[in-house]
Amino acid sequence: MASPSRPGNDCSHVIDHSHVPEFEVATWIKITLILLFLVIFVVGILGNSVTIRVTQVLQKKGYLQKEVTDHMVSLACSDILVFLIGMPVEFYSIIWNPLTTPSYTVSCKLHSFLFETCSYATLLHVLTLSFERYIAICHPFRYKAMSGPCQVKLLIGFVWVTSTLVALPLLFAMGVEYPLVDVPSHRGLSCNRSRNHHSEHPETSNMSVCTNLSSRWTVFQSSIFGAFIIYLVVLVSVAFMCWSMMQALQRSKQGTLAAKGQQLQLRKSESEESRSARRQTIIFLRLIVVTLAICWMPNQIRRMMAAAKPKQDWTKAYFKAYMILLPFSDTFFYLSSVVNPLLYNVSSQQFRSVFAQVLRCRLTLPHANQDKRLRAQAASTMDSARSVHRPLIFLASRSNSSARRTDKVFLSTSQSESEAKPQSKPQLLNHESPESDSVMKPANPATENGIQEHEV
């Protein structure tokens, strides 16, 4: 077994304050990152704000259920809070002066706690939205018993309470400290470290930053590892629910194709519309899963690197990899909050249309009931036009068929009445008389035409 001090008894391979100038980022890279983050900030705030307005309009017009609207609004709010809390600190502390930024303990703790809370609120909102759609599609009867404003408030409350509990340990684990302070009761590298003013008197060091406290190392590790497990559980759960919903829609489609008759055909068209809306929701959720997996994974890897071993044991290669990963992980993490409005627009043409209308401050979306009435009137007009242009011989055959069917219906009615009431007076109405035609004629001509066309 090789000696741990083989690379050098002076710990030259281990990171030290003297190595800080080697990892300073060039000014042009800092300016580029600030401009990139500024674009992400503006697009994220604008996109999520417009998303809140669009969902409210769609609900008011009858195109979106209130349960889904509440989930989407809460998700957009958590994304906005991520930008408002994280970006200002990102601009100055992490990008411009990542290694020498002074900070206050209270602001460090509050920023870490609030940022973690809003980040995991976004993650858990995806879970609750997927769960709500999963129950609605795979267990519709249970959904009717569970759905309602009270249940939605409970789910949203669960999201924020759980995310608060996930972030709570950071209130105790984070603080302002010289990052290379020895962790108590931790067996580090067995080599001779150079002692300096920063390590011997960290409380007066001018290189103190907002980092995990050495005295709370176990709390910090538990918090990061626990949050990573929650991240994996959410990804697996949402992926499983999306797969189950796709299977349920596939079974529903096969059952509908086996239906016959006009009444069942009507149900088929109605369920096709609902399946289309549900399919759009599933597409959105699948895109969300892919986005979370891609955009959150670099940030999770960086966090795991920070919690894997204390900074006092970081080598120069380890620290260099961490600093290279830092801007990429932060960029992808904020993109995950920007991409939600884009996914809404990709997965729903109606959302895309209303989104553009809100940006132009010109809403022209009709109510859902009005749209259905217009389609029904257009269909009725087309049916009437087709019936006017039919050949006379076809119309005559329809009339004869209608007369024969009317006789059959009338005779069966007379027979049933005579059997039920033998003492009553027999029917005196002639089947071929005009009165008979007037009695048996339906009140709605469109309905009569529809029945005759179907049976002919």
Swiss-Prot record:
GO terms for biological process: G protein-coupled receptor signaling pathway. The keyword Zinc applies. Glycans are attached at N192, N206, N212. It is found in: Cell membrane. Keywords: Cell membrane, Disulfide bond, G-protein coupled receptor, Glycoprotein, Membrane, Metal-binding, Phosphoprotein, Receptor, Transducer, Transmembrane, Transmembrane helix, Zinc. InterPro entries: GPCR_Rhodpsn, GPCR_Rhodpsn_7TM, Zinc-sensing_GPCR. Disulfide bonds join C11-C191, C108-C210. Pfam families: 7tm_1. Zn(2+) binds at H17, H19. The modification Phosphoserine is found at S397. The chain crosses the membrane at residues 35-55, 70-89, 110-131, 152-172, 218-242, 284-305, 324-344. GO terms for molecular function: G protein-coupled receptor activity; metal ion binding. Residues 56-69, 132-151, 243-283, 345-456 are cytoplasmic. GO terms for cellular component: plasma membrane. It is a multi-pass membrane protein. The keyword Isomerase does not apply. Residues 406-456 are annotated as: Disordered. Belongs to the G-protein coupled receptor 1 family. Interacts with HTR1A. Interacts with GALR1. This is G-protein coupled receptor 39. The gene is GPR39.
